[in-house]
Amino acid sequence: MNFDMIKKENSFDKILIENDKLVESMNFLKNNAEYYFDRLNTIIAVDLGLESGKFELIYDLYSTNTGLNGRISVLVERNSPHVPSVVEVFKSAYFDECEIYDMFGIVFDKNPNLKRLLMPKGWEGYPLRKDYEQNDNRLKWNK
């Protein structure tokens, strides 16, 4: 596997990879001596809008050996929002994947326990999508 990364002062440019190569790419970047990105800092989700029909996921990686940061990007189709889970490579991905599922509705296939974390049980919709319409069913707080 070859990554044409452009090295900056202490990071690499974001590189776009295909969804079906995500787990393989993460394994390679984590275990290859040249890169050794052994830490996943976070996963960021971006709604690119209805016109594009896509979401972008950005995986922020860090190498404790070299001190370099790297970013891997994948595009997810809005009408079929599925992407492979990277929990088997980075255990720290679990909560980010659940939060992104909760807020954007992106399904991380093979996540061992994908569930909503922030929204109350029974909540409909995904609040950080640009097409989300808030209804007026506000939570009733007990006094």
Which residues fall in each region the model found?
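Terminal low-complexity/charged segments
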Residues: M1-K143
